[in-house]
Amino acid sequence: MSTDKITFLTNWHATPYHAPLYLAQSKGYFKEEGLKVALLEPNDPSDVTEIIGSGKVDMGFKAMIHTLAAKARNFPVTSIGSLLDEPFTGVVYLKDSGITEDFRSLKGKKIGYVGEFGKIQIDELTKYYGMTADDYTAVRCGMNVTKAIIRGDIDAGIGLENVQMVELAEWLASQNRPRDDVQIVRIDQLAELGCCCFCSILYIANDAFLAANPEKVQKFMRAVKRATDYVLAEPAAAFEEYVDMKPIMGTPVNRKIFERSFAYFSRDLKNVSRDWAKVTNYGKRLGILDADFQPNYTNQYLSWTLDADSTDPLGDQKRMAELQKEVACEGGFKRLQVASSA
């Protein structure tokens, strides 16, 4: 880039779980590191890795599966840290849609997806349930999955437990319908992945930018780590400050999305090697990665002591599901206590 600013492109329009990034800006953490950072939002989330890979933007957010696929397509990007760890992702639907927890109930339905990999995932699942990709209608919705379900344009859509499910639950409440009429069939469970890490949201960067600016990148990550520490220590105050910077965040729905995202924030921002191995294998299974593909991540720009990995990741997933149910019912800020290796 010709500017001395770091340019950073988010994976979505400004969203409650982007709080650490925006707070690093508003609280002056970037400035204290001697950095100027321009925060940008995409028109189409599917363009993010291409824009960063082409060098038009330096850094950004993207999910793990998309980051791997970007390298496979020769877009030179690398993950340098994690924002959200393993947010539950799946087919989100309303109870009156005729869809159930049985994947085969998608037959004959219109299923919305954000970008092409959502369709690839559903297509791949059909073969395990005696179906083909022709047994359902795929509808590309971009950032409008929730609206498409509400309008009846689709019967279900791929979404996040902490975003689209919250939006739909609040819409249901506005219609005097039970909030739990929104349901999710998790893709990780359907695909027997053993983790929901394919949709972990990552900090990614252009490889040439990384090579030329290692100290800048380390400073950037130190600033967002400081902001993450603040979010985890003072979530209510942090959200109010986020609303001050981004008034569009100041709605009851966004507050609930923030509460539901709180448990997913990565405390130490590290890339989890075990998760990368699982998702790389999943990408090979989906046919989007070659057999000899090597994952594109590093923790070398994280200058603090990293937490040990969990000793019970599958158990953590079950406990996280229960914890998120509690937050959905009661609100507030809760996080999982994770057992880790010494």
Swiss-Prot record:
GO biological process: thiamine biosynthetic process; thiamine diphosphate biosynthetic process
Binding site for pyridoxal 5'-phosphate: 115-118
Active site: 66
Pathway entry: Cofactor biosynthesis; thiamine diphosphate biosynthesis
Cleaved signal peptide residues: none
Keyword annotations: Iron, Metal-binding, Pyridoxal phosphate, Thiamine biosynthesis, Transferase
Catalytic activity: N(6)-(pyridoxal phosphate)-L-lysyl-[4-amino-5-hydroxymethyl-2-methylpyrimidine phosphate synthase] + L-histidyl-[4-amino-5-hydroxymethyl-2-methylpyrimidine phosphate synthase] + 2 Fe(3+) + 4 H2O = L-lysyl-[4-amino-5-hydroxymethyl-2-methylpyrimidine phosphate synthase] + (2S)-2-amino-5-hydroxy-4-oxopentanoyl-[4-amino-5-hydroxymethyl-2-methylpyrimidine phosphate synthase] + 4-amino-2-methyl-5-(phosphooxymethyl)pyrimidine + 3-oxopropanoate + 2 Fe(2+) + 2 H(+)
One GO MF term: metal ion binding
Motif (CCCFC): 195-199
Domain of life: Eukaryota
EC number: 2.-.-.-
TM annotation in the entry: none
Cofactor: Fe cation
Modified residues (N6-(pyridoxal phosphate)lysine): 62
Upregulation: Repressed by thiamine.
Similarity-based family: Belongs to the NMT1/THI5 family.
Subunit structure as annotated in this protein's UniProt entry: Homodimer.
Functional description taken from the UniProt entry: Responsible for the formation of the pyrimidine heterocycle in the thiamine biosynthesis pathway. Catalyzes the formation of hydroxymethylpyrimidine phosphate (HMP-P) from histidine and pyridoxal phosphate (PLP). The protein uses PLP and the active site histidine to form HMP-P, generating an inactive enzyme. The enzyme can only undergo a single turnover, which suggests it is a suicide enzyme.
Protein name per the record: 4-amino-5-hydroxymethyl-2-methylpyrimidine phosphate synthase
Species the sequence originates in: Aspergillus parasiticus
